[in-house]
Amino acid sequence: MAPAFFDTRGTSPRVRERSGDIPVPEKESKPTRLTKRWSRIPLGLSLIVLSLFALTGCKPPKVSPIIFRVMTYNIHHGEGLDGKVDLDRIAKVITNANADTVALQEVDQNTKRTGGIDMAAELAKRTNMHVAFGANLDFQGGKYGTAILSKHPIESYENHVLKQARDGEPRGVLQAVLDVGQGRLLFAGTHLDHTRDQGERLFSQTQFDELFAKYEDLPIIFCGDFNDTPGSELHKRMSENWFDSWELVGQGPGLTMTSDNPTRRIDYVWVSDKKNFKLRWTDVPKTDASDHLPVVAEMEFKPAP
């Protein structure tokens, strides 16, 4: 297996793209003792008892909410502020957070610059989690994209490469349906355009409704590096259909970029609603394992059957 450390100083940490002004788009048993007992009760009496249950409004016990912890983390292809690629360091950040599910951005798969390592698979081994990888770009003999790690089984997943308003680095949305024991949820991750012009990010956002429509019966968590700050047009449009976990329960500014001296909040954990999700807390752990800081959020949620 390739070594875990690589010195990538002197190479471009990200794929460069052409900038330009982009028009902003518009907007399934055996009988139990109880059932045997009920079988000896005359039918008429059974009907009376059942009617009483109906009249009194008795219902089956509700499923208790699940405590669920998520993380989003742009790992900068495993490269820390020291210019070295160290997957053990990244894995430690993930493990220390004890997250149930993690959305990762800037993930290399078999590229030359990181020694041909399948980063998503290696991080899954180091953290003992299930994994899904979404490739958005062919790069240096391999692939580059996003990934999802999960302690819970991944029932299905799909990666959508987004349409672009101009030539540049392709972006995508990776969606995974998770079986959390008592039910299911959809966990998704993305990494949007990083250039100053907001047009490409807004064009990406216009595609989200269609991508999530087939999962409208599931509670949804949508994480990632959105490369835009609170108060931006992107954040305003996202807030029309999603709830920003930091705005709900975060303390302080929640800055995530750059990790040694963060001045911007561009990494987010969004939830689809406040009926199925009750945020408990959110945090930005300090680490120099990447140029971004991770965001961790814990919540109570009601899974879909």
Predicted regions and their residues:
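Active-site metal-binding loops of divalent metal-dependent hydrolases
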Residues: 73-75, 107, 190-192, 225-226, ...
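Active-site-proximal beta-strand elements of phosphoester/diester hydrolases
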Residues: 67-79, 158, 175, 184-192
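Structured beta-strand-rich core segments of catalytic domains in phosphoester-bond hydrolases
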Residues: 82, 101, 107-184, 276, ...
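Active-site neighborhood of phospho(di)ester-bond hydrolases with catalytic His/Asp-centered motifs
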Residues: 103-105, 132-135, 221-225, 244-246
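Short, flexible loop segments at the rims of nucleotide/cofactor-binding pockets, characterized by
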Residues: 77-82, 109-110, 165, 196-200, ...
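Metal-dependent phosphoester-hydrolase catalytic domains
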Residues: 59-60, 177, 199, 206, ...
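N-terminal, active-site-proximal structural segment of metallo-dependent hydrolase catalytic domains
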Residues: 27, 40-44, 49-126, 138-143, ...
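Intrinsic disorder/low-complexity segments
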Residues: 1-46
